[in-house]
Amino acid sequence: SSIGVNNIASIETEFKENELTRINIESYKITANRIDDLVRDCNIFIRNFTEKYGNPSYQKDKVNISEFNSGEEFEYAKYQIGDKTITILLGEQSREVKFYYKIYIENDKFPKKKHVQTEKEKKEEQRRMKEAKEIKENSF
């Protein structure tokens, strides 16, 4: 990518009322010997965010392999800029010992008018919940 980050697997965006409300960036799941690569990517994001927004409101000093727990995520850095929150998480998968980062960029300045779900959106949401449930049930 243009900022020198190598491990991005996916970028998802969420909109409400045509406003971008959330960006989710997720890395590939990689093995323990490459945790440094994940941290390096996160630090590149932090450098870029800091240039744009100033220092994070929270940042961990260093990451130790012992801080990872199966199936859990922890905050590596967080920015609070007005209505915007940027959270950088590191985590370990529960089923296999693989590690990843996630970055959430959220904008809380939601439009005031309440969004009424269309039938299509309702069905879509039900389908997603059902899929998530099936994935959970089939993964054990």
What function would you assign to each model-found segment?
Residues 1-17, 126-140:
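N-terminal leader/targeting segments
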Residues 27-140:
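Non-cytosolic coordination micro-motifs
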